[in-house]
Every structure is written in C-alpha cells, then in structure tokens.
Amino acid sequence: MEPWVQLKQAGLEPSGLGPLPKALRVPPPEGNPGQALMSSGAELGGARELILWIWEELGNLRRVDVQLLGQLCDLGLEMGTFREELVTILEEEEEEEEQEEKSCVEENKGPEEKQDEERSRSSYPAQRLPDFGMTI
C-alpha cells in the first residue's frame, strides 16, 4: 500500500503498530467460493447462498479498510507537513520576540537590568510543540 510506505519513509508511522495485516498488503483473492462449491458437487442448499453473501461482504469490508487506511496515511502525511510548518512559525516568532526584546532593552535599561532580564528569561522552559500523535 503506497500511502503506508510514504508514511513510514517520512518517519510518521505510529509507534507500536507493527506491519500492515496481510489482508491489506496483498491483492484480494481471485475467484468465487461458489465455484468451488459447485465443482465439489455438494448439495448445500441455502448454505451456498449464505457463503456467497459472506464472501461479498468480506470483499466490501476489505475495500473500505483499504480506503480508510489510505485516508489515515494521507492525514498522517499532512500532519507531518503541518508540524514542520509549525516549527518554522514558532522559530520565526521566537526570533522576532528576541529582536524586539533586545531593542527595547537597549533603549530603556542599563547594563545591570539587561543581565537580570537575561537570567530570568533563561529560567523559563522552552516552548514545546504539541504532540500530534496518530493511532491507526
């Protein structure tokens, strides 16, 4: 599945998830279970119709699973892009704030007050990025 590979290559694969299930890695099986039932010559009556209905529903569920997995992988890739953009924005804002503070400090304060402010600023914890964890 191509989106899953892209997600892994981008380093955005959710931890602890493991590999994709075999049912989503390989193409669906060809053929029809009804053909096997007919060739065996067994008289199954209503069981044949029930098996065919179950087979069809399993195929529908597999298609939905593949579609949902593709959408989740696409969302994971978008979240990775947004995270990178957020890091860039936060870094730019931090640089702007530092420049503004430097200009204000230089205009309004003496040397002792500048040192006090630098010490107090270093005691604040660094801004942390939100954790955009994803679970599939």
UniProtKB/Swiss-Prot annotation:
Record Pfam families: DUF4530 (PF15039)
Start and end residues of each stretch annotated as Disordered: 92-136
Superkingdom of source: Eukaryota
Biased amino acid composition, Basic and acidic residues: 101-121
Coiled-coil region: none
SS bonds (residue pairs): none
Protein name: Glutamate-rich protein 4
This protein's encoding gene: Erich4
